[in-house]
Regions:
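Catalytic palm subdomain of template-directed nucleic-acid polymerases
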Residues: 630-662
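C-terminal, non-catalytic extensions of nucleic-acid polymerases
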Residues: 660-915
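DnaQ-like (DEDDh/DEDDy) 3′-5′ exonuclease domain used for proofreading
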Residues: 1-174, 287, 291-353, 400-409, ...
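Glycine- and acidic
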Residues: 148-152, 172-176, 274-280, 412-421, ...
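Common nucleic-acid-contacting/processivity interface regions adjacent to the catalytic cores
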Residues: 18-21, 272-354, 399-450, 456, ...
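Basic/aromatic-rich interaction segments and small domains that mediate binding to polyanionic partners
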Residues: 357, 362-396
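Active-site-proximal helix-loop-helix substrate-binding element of RNase H-like nuclease domains
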Residues: 132-135, 142-154, 174, 178, ...
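Proline-aspartate-enriched helix->loop->beta-strand connector
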Residues: 166-190
Length: 915
């Protein structure tokens, strides 16, 4: 089975594929893909049912009847050579890697590319032997070499020696997979650029076993590809596989949370640690790779990635792109069936390209974030220029960006803020995959659609059509799958209804209709994945009963891999350039709008059902919803049915019974919806289930809540269990709070959920605020970032002045950065201490009245001027630090709970004036 693949698109060996296999080792060969031309007398059949014949050799790229001409070469090779086998390799040479460099300032794509700072140490772990290595720069020759206990410390007199010895080990270990943390952005490119600068162009190529290294200047997130070596960034894998957003993605925080292993703590800067305590510096450097090792032992994201990539027959670096994963999987599935795939819609019809000038774009890798607006596109160069929200022009690779979604997402019911009791959920099982299967959705089953004003309309169902005037004319569109153009037309309402019912077409909430006489390939693949997942779940259970824990973990990985693939398919329909979509977001709108319609109809049914049962004037019992789930307060029904029950355990048991009855009725309602709304006359896959019972819940807004879960999937959850508390998005415990305040907010919410009295809550707040007087001031600093700087400097300091004049409405963080920069320049410390630049992370310190008459300063937290630190310690305003972070949040919380005003104390100024 393949271990790595590299295809040469340029140079003397253009068209050569380099392939490493766990049995055959390295091979290289010219790859000439087979393409297919539409031919009524051909022996092969396409996805759309047309006949075609194979062509080998040259062909006219602009000929729209030539199919499979735009398949990425790596995907073509892996499909053609391995389509009969989904297994992963029996072995890999994996290393965990981390580097440290001299202080460089802000890490930007350009500063990494310039690579002006020395590499001071390189730590790695060879997974095959578990041996740890640390190469450290030791120009003072004060460090003794170590080679014992499976750990080797190699001091090097010069950086050139360090890099040369590291390269020797790299060649010896011959890695197939290298794993770091934020390594695609920093470690890998920095090693390459610094090594090229110090060792030269020829030696740096030895990082690649085939002497091929790609430098993609337009992909700042992963600019370097080392041919023959798979680079996997654990930070990106954490963002991919851990669905909830983490408060922090720093390695130390993730390691502490998931592997109980954090960073080595130290005072001052890393440069100072390197100079003053090299032994601890070595320990610090090794700890980073030890954390990666511990994370992988716990989470097994590398193994999971390799499994998924081999199930999909794609290179490992494709793991971050669901479009590539799903394309590889379906290409392979169709190859096994002897079916020829279509070209991408954007290959056939250039006018529906994914990106246009003026589009808002977001990153495809990691957590999607809106970055800016496109101002220029260079399709041949594979790049675009964007203008960020900070009005800065940047270049980006077309492979790493996508257009901001322009279709409906999941339905979010706006909750009424407050505290709720005895809550149950109604959760759709795999909502989007079930919609694809129920509608028989696919580009080859898509018949046409009713023209809508936008991609957010949800009321073009069969039921709505029957309420229209039968003689009214509707605008419709049909997709021409040979040209990917939309053919427009008109049809009377009654004629369309007749066509839908006679042909048994399913119709989505957005007005697209799909044939059911053939099964779409997406449905086939989803059903295959579902069966495979169930198969491995059964094997996992069997292994668990036999206490075969090695296979238990393996089967668990396989079932998780298939779950991830199932849930990833729907999003690819929104990408115009995905091979198996329509190019107009018709299919994607069908999925998400139908999902919204199902959720809304279910909420309507549940509210109506409970209104009739309880009959107390209340009309809304569903508190909130989030894409595929709704939360229902059953307190009134519980009190009505069982008014005399006082035992809490018995209440929960009865609550489970009531919620199950409600779910049964709601599922019967889904049977009606599938027929009336979607015209699904056969089996549908829509299903609601009850998963959690919540004793107490607090909602402050959409996706902002805290729940005390007492039962999950029928299993009682004790209050101290890790699953007992589910908190998300609450303002009082934001990720950008100082940890001290964030922990206080979390504990406060816990107390509220656990029925602590208001009087005790009031006291808890007072005690916390009073405690700040004796707490280390550094724990109060507010973490933030610097987005703007120079535009808020109205006038630089004149002779004899210290501080700049600021423009109006200068943000507080910008003000703090400007004042600190001014102080550093005034004290002539710019060579020892860095000034703030746009993009830097920083900490804010609010100040009391002081000799400088400034109210805030910024600190970087690792290499601050001792004079500035001493000044901040003397004049920090702890009152203002509390007010800026917590005051409004606490007031909003009390308002949500209808507790009135927050009484911090009876005599605030006297009681809480910090020294």
């Amino acid at each position: 089975m393949y271990q790595s693949i590299y295809y040469s698109y340029n140079g003397e060996d253009k068209g050569t594929c380099y392939l490493r296999d766990d049995k055959g080792g390295w091979s290289s060969f010219k790859y000439y893909p087979t393409v297919y031309k539409l031919d009524p007398d051909g022996e092969h059949v396409t996805l759309f049912g047309d006949y075609c014949s194979p062509i080998r050799g040259k062909f006219d790229w602009n000929d729209p009847t030539i199919l499979e001409k735009d398949i990425q070469k790596e995907l073509g090779v892996l499909r053609d050579l391995y389509y009969k086998d989904d297994s992963a390799p029996t072995s890999h040479n994996t290393i965990y890697l981390d580097i440290e460099i001299e202080i460089l300032g802000t890490l930007t794509p350009q500063s990494i590319r310039d690579a002006n700072a020395k590499i001071t140490s390189i730590a790695l772990i060879d997974v095959n032997t578990s041996k740890k290595y640390c190469y450290i720069l030791d120009d003072k020759q004060s460090i003794e070499p170590v080679d014992k206990d499976n750990k080797k410390i190699i001091p090097c007199f010069t950086e050139q020696e360090l890099l040369s010895k590291f390269l020797d080990l790299w060649i010896e270990l011959d890695p197939t997979v290298v794993v770091g943390y934020n390594s695609d952005f920093f470690d890998i490119p920095y090693i390459y650029f610094r090594m090229r600068k110090i060792l030269g162009e020829e030696l740096v190529l030895f990082l690649s076993p085939i002497k091929k290294i790609n430098d993609n200047i337009y992909n700042p997130h992963s600019p370097i590809t080392i041919g023959g070596v798979n680079s996997l960034d654990y930070m990106l894998l954490v963002k991919k596989y851990i669905m909830k957003e983490e408060p922090s993605y720093k390695l130390g925080d993730i390691g502490t949370k998931y592997a109980k292993l954090g960073k080595i703590e130290y005072n001052g800067s890393l440069d100072r640690l390197f100079r003053d305590d090299p032994d601890k510096f070595i320990e610090y450097n090794l700890r980073d790779v030890e954390i990666i090792e511990a994370l992988e032992n716990k989470l097994q994201f590398i193994k999971l990635t390799i499994l998924i990539c081999h199930l999909c027959h794609v290179p490992y670096d494709s793991i971050y792109y669901n479009t590539v994963l799903n394309e590889g999987a379906i290409l392979t599935y169709l190859k096994r069936k002897g079916i020829v795939s279509p070209n991408k819609p954007t290959t056939t019809n250039k006018s529906i390209k994914e990106l246009n000038i003026g589009d808002e774009i977001q990153h495809q890798r990691g957590t999607p974030t809106i970055e800016g607006t496109i101002t220029y596109i260079d399709e041949r160069g594979g790049k675009c220029q964007i203008r960020t929200k900070s009005n800065i022009l940047k270049e980006r690779s077309l492979k790493t960006v996508r257009k901001k979604d322009s279709y409906a997402g999941g339905y979010l019911l706006e909750p009424t803020p407050g505290l709720y009791s005895y809550v149950s959920d109604a959760d759709f099982t795999s909502l989007y995959p079930s919609i694809i299967k129920s509608l028989n959705l696919g580009v080859e089953t898509l018949v046409g659609r009713i023209v809508t004003k936008n991609n957010y309309e949800q009321y073009n169902s069969l039921e709505q059509l029957k309420q229209l005037n039968p003689e009214d004319q509707l605008d419709i569109e049909k997709l021409n799958t040979k040209t990917y153009n939309l053919k427009k037309g008109k049809i009377r309402v009654k004629d369309l209804i007749e066509l839908i019912e006679e042909n048994n077409w399913s119709i989505s909430a957005s007005g697209a209709f799909y044939r059911n006489d053939i099964k779409s390939i997406s449905c086939e693949v989803l059903e295959d994945w579902f069966k495979q997942r169930e198969h491995y779940r059964e094997l996992k259970k069997k292994a668990g009963k036999q206490e075969d824990w090695e296979n238990y973990k393996l089967y668990d990985l396989y079932q998780l891999a298939f779950k991830i693939l199932q849930n990833a398919l729907y999003g690819t329909y929104a990408i115009n350039g995905w091979r198996y979509t329509d190019g107009y977001k018709i299919c994607s709108a069908s999925i998400t709008n139908s999902g919204q319609r199902l959720t809304k109809e279910s909420i309507l049914f549940i509210n109506g059902k409970l209104e009739n049962l309880v009959n107390n004037g209340r009309k809304e019992f569903v508190i909130a919803s989030d894409t595929d789930s709704a939360y229902v307060e059953l307190k009134d029904l519980l009190n009505l049915k069982y008014p005399d029950i006082t035992d809490e355990g018995e209440k929960i048991s009865k609550l489970i019974e009531l919620s199950q009855e409600l779910i049964t009725d709601a599922n019967q309602n889904l049977d009606n919806i599938s027929r009336k709304v979607f015209n699904i006359q056969r089996k549908h896959y829509f299903e609601l289930k009850q998963e959690v019972i919540v004793k107490k819940a607090y909602w402050s807004g959409k996706r902002r809540y805290a729940m005390w879960i007492v039962n999950k999937e029928g299993v009682p959850i004790p209050p101290d269990h890790k699953d007992a508390l589910d908190m998300k998005g609450l303002d009082i415990m934001k990720s950008n709070f100082p940890p001290l305040f964030r922990d206080f907010g979390e504990e406060l919410i816990k107390k509220i959920l656990f029925d602590t009295s208001k009087q005790e809550i009031d006291k808890y707040i007072l005690d916390f605020r009073k405690s700040l007087d004796t707490i280390d001031w550094r724990k109060l600093l507010k973490p933030t970032g610097l987005k703007k700087l120079d535009e808020y400097i109205a006038k630089k300091p004149a002779a004899g002045e210290i501080f700049s004049k600021l423009a109006l409405k200068c943000p507080t963080n910008t003000k703090g950065a400007i004042y600190t920069n001014d102080l550093i320049r005034f004290k002539k410390q710019t060579k020892q201490y860095e000034t703030f630049q746009v993009g830097d992370k920083m900490y804010l310190a609010y100040l009391k009245e002081n000799p400088y008459h400034v109210d805030v300063l910024g600190l970087n937290g690792y290499n601050d001027s001792p004079e500035i630190l001493e000044f901040v310690e003397k004049y920090i305003d702890k009152n203002q630090m509390f007010e800026s972070v917590m005051k409004n949040k606490l007031e909003n919380l009390y308002q949500d709970l209808k507790w009135g005003a927050v009484i911090f104390n009876n005599n605030v100024n006297k009681f809480f004036t910090f020294s």
